Amino acid sequence: MSSIYEGFLDMISTLFSLLLSAGNPALAARDTFYPPLNHTTYITNASVGTYGGIYNAPADQASTPTAQDVYNYCSMPHPRVETYSLPPPVANQSVAARLVYLEYVQRHQRRTPYNILPGGENQAYHCNNLQAHLYVSAASQGPAPIPVYGQTYSDPSNPFLANYVNGSCQYPQLTIGGYLDGYQHGRDLGAVYRDQLQLIPSSPDENNGKKIWLRSSTSALTQGSAGGVLRGVWPEFNAPLPLHQQASGVDTVDQGYSCSARSEVLSAIESTAEWNEHLTVTQSLRNHLATMFDADTSSWMSNFDHFSDNFQARLCNGYELPCSLQNETQCATVGQAEEVFRAGDWEWNYWWRHNANATRYIQLVEGLFIGEIVRHLEAVQQGTSELVYSHSFVHDGDIGPILGALGIKALRWPGMGSNIAFEVCMGSQVSRQTSNEDFYARVLYSGHAIETIYGTLDWIPLSSLISILQPYIPDDIISLCQSS
């Protein structure tokens, strides 16, 4: 367990960061990504608020980016022309380099909640301003389908609706705000990597489509996000695009394949003194919310996943925090929501960074997909790949372990549209009288060089980046999953 002294240091770090942010807004923007999360004092210190993070967005329009790209759970920052900068050695011209490959991994955009309050919802969710298309077509011959879409409705005669939620949405599903955020996300990527850096091809079918690789989970959330983002990247393209997916039962993202050891390791992680301490210091909050929303079950009380998800989805789509259906004067307060969000951040940092089993847990959950990323990087290094741009649409449960594998300094819950950009450059020292070029890498998290236990990954040999990730790729995942 972290000592009282460590907790005191975390408190001092928190106060110092808040004071620093008042005098240096540019520095404060990046500080919002790296709170002192290693002690539970971060959760209980109400003066921290959201640690500069944003938890609100308009209902039916795209989110507005902040000037300095602060942590925004509803629509995480991403590379865009206004804030993008070249790697320092390239910017100061000590190295002559060109970008040759981009591996881009992102979470889907904002959505409705997975978790509906057990006592029912006092506000309806509306999604009739979005069409969730549901159709197939023959690959080469055959009649063209009618492009049907799903239109959710609430039937007042359905008795189960009383303790559920009225409206025209599925739970979860992408919202119009999420779709528009995705479109802007793609426009910004195109402006940086297609127009400014001339890496992404002007059309996805260039060189018979061999320059790009598009991947997603089997979820409608990631597929719908891909449609919006890729329209932003290629606004003039008017043909279908393949979005590659593995079979859901063996998918290497979104915990697709069965692995009994995963739950065993997670159980061990959530049985530690540190984990129990965070439950102890939040007991009063959890009891209050459980009583208010009839949520006194293990799935709602054993961690903050469900309450965070419910509150985030409301605030990120223009709704209010929930009130009890039995007594609408009893509502979740802003202060309670902020503590829920801080606890959620603490949990994510603990799952993927701060517990003794983090390496094995990452191997079990995300090791195979990390292996896919590394194989892409190695193929570029070896000159055997035609790819210049790979884009994967995944989930927070994929982004978190990848950030953990990179050794991120502190891990807040990866918000909607959170993204990791692995940039690979070929370059040589300007001062050297040689034509030899080496491969270098930079890793951006939400548009800026990631801060890690290895330092800021803004310009390192590609081989060093591969070495950082390699320990998280299991040699034999089947045996590892069967081990106890």
List where the protein language model places each region.
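Fungal secretory targeting signals
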Residues: 1-30
